[in-house]
C-alpha cells in the first residue's frame, strides 16, 4: 500500500468517546451526503489477533472490517482503519464485561457445534423427533461447557485492567478486530477530531482529511 493512497482521504466516521474511522479511498473530495465506508483497494487482509498482547486501549490503531454475518473469518479491510478513543471504565464494569465475554464464548462454541450437527438436526426436525432434538441439545450444551472450560474463562490481563481504568479504551472490541499499531505521538489531535461536530451519519460537519508518510527505521 503506497502512502499516496491515503492522501486526501477523510476521517469519514467519527463517534465521540469511541473512535475515529478513515481510509476509504471513495472519501476523497466526497460531497456531504455521499455514503462512505465501503471503499478499499480491492482486497482484504486475514485477521491477525495477537491477544491479549495487543488490545483496544486509547490510541490503538486497528483495522476496520465488515460484520461477522458477511465476514465470519473477520478479515480486515485492505485500507480502512480506526483509532480508538473510548472511555475510562470502572473495575466493576470490566468484571461485568468479563461475564459477558464468557457467555459470548459459550455461545460461539455452541453455534459451531450446531453447525457441525446441522444435517442431524435437519433429519430430527423432518421426522418431528422432539425427544431426539432435546437429547441432542443437552449433548451439545454439555460439550459446550466442556470446551469452554478447556479454553478457560476469558479475563482481562493486569495490563488491560490498568489501561482501561486509567487511560481508557474500547474493551468490547478486543479479540474482534485486528490491532496493528498505536499512536505514539499526537493523541491530542485524535482528541480534537473525536470532539468535532458531526452530522447524522457520523461524518464530521467540516471535512477532516489526512496525509500519510511512511517512516522506515
Task: Label each PLM-derived region with a short phrase.
Residues 1-217:
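Cyclophilin-like peptidyl-prolyl cis-trans isomerases
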Amino acid at each position: 500500500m503506497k502512502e499516496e493512497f491515503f492522501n486526501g482521504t477523510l476521517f469519514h466516521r467519527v463517534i465521540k468517546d469511541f473512535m475515529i474511522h478513515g481510509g476509504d479511498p471513495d472519501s476523497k473530495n466526497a460531497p456531504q451526503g455521499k455514503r462512505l465506508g465501503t471503499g478499499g483497494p480491492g482486497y482484504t487482509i486475514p485477521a491477525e489477533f495477537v491477544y491479549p498482547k495487543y488490545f483496544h486501549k486509547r490510541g490503538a490503531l486497528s483495522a476496520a472490517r465488515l460484520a461477522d454475518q458477511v465476514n465470519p473469518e473477520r478479515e480486515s479491510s485492505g485500507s480502512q482503519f480506526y483509532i480508538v478513543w473510548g472511555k475510562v471504565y470502572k473495575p466493576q464494569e470490566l468484571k461485568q464485561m468479563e461475564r459477558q465475554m464468557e457467555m459470548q464464548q459459550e455461545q460461539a462454541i455452541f453455534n459451531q457445534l450446531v453447525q457441525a450437527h446441522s444435517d442431524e438436526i435437519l433429519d430430527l426436525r423432518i421426522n418431528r423427533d422432539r425427544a431426539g432434538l432435546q437429547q441432542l441439545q443437552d449433548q451439545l450444551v454439555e460439550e459446550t461447557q466442556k470446551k469452554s472450560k478447556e479454553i478457560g474463562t476469558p479475563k482481562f490481563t493486569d495490563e488491560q485492567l490498568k489501561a482501561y481504568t486509567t487511560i481508557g479504551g474500547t474493551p468490547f472490541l478486543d479479540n474482534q478486530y485486528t490491532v496493528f499499531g498505536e499512536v505514539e505521538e499526537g493523541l491530542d489531535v485524535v482528541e480534537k477530531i473525536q470532539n468535532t461536530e458531526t452530522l447524522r451519519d457520523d461524518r464530521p460537519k467540516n471535512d477532516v482529511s489526512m496525509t500519510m508518510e511512511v517512516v522506515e527505521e
